[in-house]
Amino acid sequence: MRDRLVIDFAAAEGAVVRMIGLVERRGFRVCGIAMAEEEEKASLTLDLQPLDAKRSVDVLALQLGRLHEVRNVAISGFPS
């Protein structure tokens, strides 16, 4: 099963690398990525697939929300 995360964050040096690194370390594969940026804020959309059934996208969203630059994380189902 795939999930989609939409992450709103403050555009800062290294922010995208930190978020993607956390996603991969927590056992998810990035299947798609899109980003939009305006001045000092940005939005990152990640299509994810867990590497095993034990991985929870809800826990991942909480962990991403703890990063300094992250303002909001929304979970949505992967479109069919």
Model-derived features: positions:
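A conserved regulatory-domain signal marking ACT and ACT-like small-molecule sensing domains
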Residues: 1-80
